[in-house]
Amino acid sequence: MARTKQTARKSTGGKAPRKQLATKAWNTLATATGGVKKPHRFRPGTVALREIRKYQKSTELLIRKLPFQRLVREIAQDFKTDLRFQSSAVAALQEASEAYLVGLFEDTNLCAIHAKRVTIMPKDMQLARRIRGERA
C-alpha cells in the first residue's frame, strides 16, 4: 500500500484523530496470515505476583479517600447526628483501617497456607479473627 503524505490540520479540541494507515495495513497482514492475532495474556498468577510486589513497595493508601470518608460519616450517623470530622481524623482512621486490613489478610493467607491451599477463603478469615480473639 502506498504511503500518503500527512498534512497538518487545525485542532478543534478533544482527542487527536487516529491514523488509519497502520490499522489498514495490520488488517491486511492478519487476513493474509489466516486470522486475527490474539492479544498477549500473561500466565495465571504472574500479574498477581507483580501486583503483590508493587503494593508491598508502595506506601500510599489503597482505599480512595472520599468513599472512605463517606463510609465513616455513615457509620458515625448511627451513634450521633451532625458530627463533624477534621481531615486529619479521617486520615488517621483510614491509616489505621488499612493497617488492620493488611494484617488480617496476612494472617488469613497464613491460615490458607496451613490448610495447604493458596486461595484464601472466608473460613480462613474467620479462623484468623478467632485466633486473634476478635470473634468468639
From Swiss-Prot:
Q: Which CDD domains match?
A: HFD_H3 (cd22911)
Its Gene Ontology cellular component terms are: nucleosome; nucleus
Q: How is it modified after translation?
A: Acetylation is generally linked to gene activation. Can be acetylated to form H3K9ac, H3K14ac, H3K18ac and H3K23ac. H3K9ac could compete with H3K9me and prevent gene silencing. H3K9ac is restricted to euchromatin. Methylated to form mainly H3K4me, H3K9me, H3K18me, H3K23me and H3K36me. H3K4me1/2/3, H3K9me3 and H3K36me1/2/3 are typical marks for euchromatin, whereas heterochromatic chromocenters are enriched in H3K9me1/2. H2BK143ub1 is probably prerequisite for H3K4me.
Q: Which InterPro entries match?
A: Histone-fold, Histone_H2A/H2B/H3, Histone_H3/CENP-A
Q: Which UniProt keywords apply?
A: Acetylation, Chromosome, DNA-binding, Methylation, Nucleosome core, Nucleus, Phosphoprotein
Instruction: Identify residues that carry Phosphoserine.
Output: S11
Q: Which PROSITE patterns match?
A: HISTONE_H3_1, HISTONE_H3_2
Gene3D superfamilies recorded for this chain? Answer: Histone, subunit A (1.10.20.10)
Sites bearing N6-acetyllysine, chain numbering: K10, K15, K19, K24
Instruction: Indicate the principal place this protein occupies in or around the cell.
Output: nucleus
Indicate where the modification N6-methylated lysine is found in the sequence. K5, K10, K19, K24, K37
Q: Where in the cell is it found?
A: Nucleus; Chromosome
Chain segments carrying region Disordered: 1-20
Gene Ontology MF term list: DNA binding; protein heterodimerization activity; structural constituent of chromatin
Q: Does the keyword Disulfide bond apply?
A: no
Phosphothreonine PTM positions read T12
Subunit field text: The nucleosome is a histone octamer containing two molecules each of H2A, H2B, H3 and H4 assembled in one H3-H4 heterotetramer and two H2A-H2B heterodimers. The octamer wraps approximately 147 bp of DNA.
**Which function does this protein serve?**
Core component of nucleosome. Nucleosomes wrap and compact DNA into chromatin, limiting DNA accessibility to the cellular machineries which require DNA as a template. Histones thereby play a central role in transcription regulation, DNA repair, DNA replication and chromosomal stability. DNA accessibility is regulated via a complex set of post-translational modifications of histones, also called histone code, and nucleosome remodeling.
Identify its protein family: Belongs to the histone H3 family.
This protein is called Histone H3.2
